[in-house]
């Protein structure tokens, strides 16, 4: 677990005695533990997330960098049963096309297809799902890619802040298939749906990450 509850905020960092270099090293170690320790979890306990923890997780997202400081995000945290039921119902309408995509992508791993479809039917029992939208529907073609990246950066912040609190997460892109319906229902007047973060207390041991090779170069 990310050492130090809320360690991303300077005021709550438990600074060790010693030089400024030692203090800096401790902060960096905690941050790297969070980055490397976070995993996607797809099965959750029924325990609700305290409202104050959810607020802090969202606030962490709002601290993310954004293109031209536009802060082009709008987040909707679903916690009510009727809202979650609506989400699951809309995702059900896209299940067939989603399965076809997964079968093409994982043709040698059919178990992955089945596991994913089972997860998508009820998001692993999560009681809290954050939908990430663009704040406006009319960003220019030049700005749009950067605005999408900005929302993604905020969502990553939320995943790390959740991990800091012992709360598991899973970034889900499949919700965009039902983006029009979800946007009309939950975010009228705002922009397109970029993705979702599923939150909860883990009820499974996540798989280790298998990193693909040759994905960067230092010159």
Tell me the role of every PLM-derived stretch.
Residues 182-195:
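Short, electropositive alpha-helical surface patch
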Residues 26-48, 52-56:
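Short acidic N-proximal helix/loop "leader" segments that mark the beginning
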Residues 77-150:
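Glycine/small-residue-rich phosphate/adenosyl-binding loop
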Residues 9-28:
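Short, Lys/Arg-enriched N-terminal segments with co-localized hydrophobic residues
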Residues 33-41, 117, 193-219:
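C-terminal helix-cap and adjacent tail motif
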Residues 65-69:
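Glycine-rich phosphate/pyrophosphate-binding beta-alpha loops
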Residues 56-57, 61, 128-130, 136-184:
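Small-aliphatic-rich amphipathic alpha-helix that forms the alpha element of a beta-alpha
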């Amino acid at each position: 677990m990310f050492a130090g509850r809320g360690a991303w905020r300077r005021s709550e960092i438990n600074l060790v005695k010693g030089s400024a270099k030692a203090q800096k090293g401790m902060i960096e170690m905690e941050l790297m533990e969070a980055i490397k320790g976070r995993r996607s979890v797809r099965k959750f306990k029924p325990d609700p997330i305290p409202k104050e923890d959810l607020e802090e997780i969202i606030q962490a997202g709002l601290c993310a960098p954004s293109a031209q400081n536009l802060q082009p995000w709008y987040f909707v945290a679903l916690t009510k049963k009727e809202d979650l039921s609506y989400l699951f119902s809309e995702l059900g309408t896209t299940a067939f096309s989603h399965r076809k995509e997964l079968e093409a992508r994982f043709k040698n791993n059919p178990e992955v297809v089945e596991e994913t479809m089972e997860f998508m039917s009820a998001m692993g029992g999560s009681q809290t799902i954050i939908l990430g939208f663009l704040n406006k529907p009319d960003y220019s073609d030049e700005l749009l890619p950067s605005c999408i990246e900005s929302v993604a950066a905020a969502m990553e912040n939320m995943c790390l802040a959740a991990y800091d609190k012992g709360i598991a997460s899973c970034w889900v892109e499949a919700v965009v298939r039902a983006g029009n319906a979800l946007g009309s229902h939950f975010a009228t007047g705002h922009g397109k749906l970029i993705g979702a973060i599923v939150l909860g207390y883990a009820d499974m041991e996540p798989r280790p990450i298998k990193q693909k090779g040759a994905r960067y170069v230092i010159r």
